[in-house]
């Protein structure tokens, strides 16, 4: 993809929302993953658990232009040091969590794929589980609604596809509850 884009003079951006989960899974450094792209975005609020915050990285010229655009569009934020401190804390203290999230997703995925109305599942490589239900199962939206009534949140990812994301706020107990409630909902 990078080669093709660059052959047409295009700038290549990496949405690095899950970059650190990939790093935890493979041991490949973030620098290596981003080596061939022009820009990368890393979100601190997803797997790292910061309240908000992200970093956009690229060439010095690109960053100057991005900064100007941010200011022109009203993106200035006052007293952001407190949020920056939370991001630094997350980097210093939650990196190991990425492996825990990945392992938990794999464990949950292994159990979900065995449920009778589950048709298939994408490979669970990091902390994201995407699976489809068979045509005669409730729709994804119906499953989401039924689980929400049971205080379990899951995302519809299409008419028959569902998405689960593990993160700092999802522990093994929550994973077990998800599988138990999903089993109940798919049995009705």
Q: Can you say where each PLM-predicted feature lies in the sequence?
A:
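Conserved PLP-enzyme active-site core in the AAT-like
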Residues: 1-122, 126-150, 155-170, 174, ...
């Amino acid at each position: 993809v990078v080669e093709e884009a660059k052959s047409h003079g295009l700038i290549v951006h990496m949405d690095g929302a899950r970059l650190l989960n990939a790093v935890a899974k493979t041991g490949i450094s973030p620098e290596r993953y981003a080596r061939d792209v022009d820009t990368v975005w890393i979100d601190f609020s997803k797997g790292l658990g910061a309240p908000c915050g992200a970093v956009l990285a690229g060439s010095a010229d690109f960053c100057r232009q991005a900064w100007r655009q941010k200011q022109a569009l009203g993106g200035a934020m006052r007293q952001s040091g407190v949020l920056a401190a939370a991001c630094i804390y997350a980097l210093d203290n939650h990196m190991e969590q990425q492996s825990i999230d990945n392992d938990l997703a794999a464990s949950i995925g292994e159990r979900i794929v065995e449920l009778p109305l589950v048709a298939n599942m994408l490979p669970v490589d990091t902390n994201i589980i995407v699976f489809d239900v068979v045509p005669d199962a409730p729709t994804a939206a119906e499953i989401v609604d039924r689980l929400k009534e049971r205080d379990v949140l899951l995302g519809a990812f299409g008419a028959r596809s569902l998405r689960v994301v593990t993160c700092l706020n999802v522990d093994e107990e929550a994973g077990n509850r998800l599988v138990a409630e999903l089993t109940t909902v798919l049995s009705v």
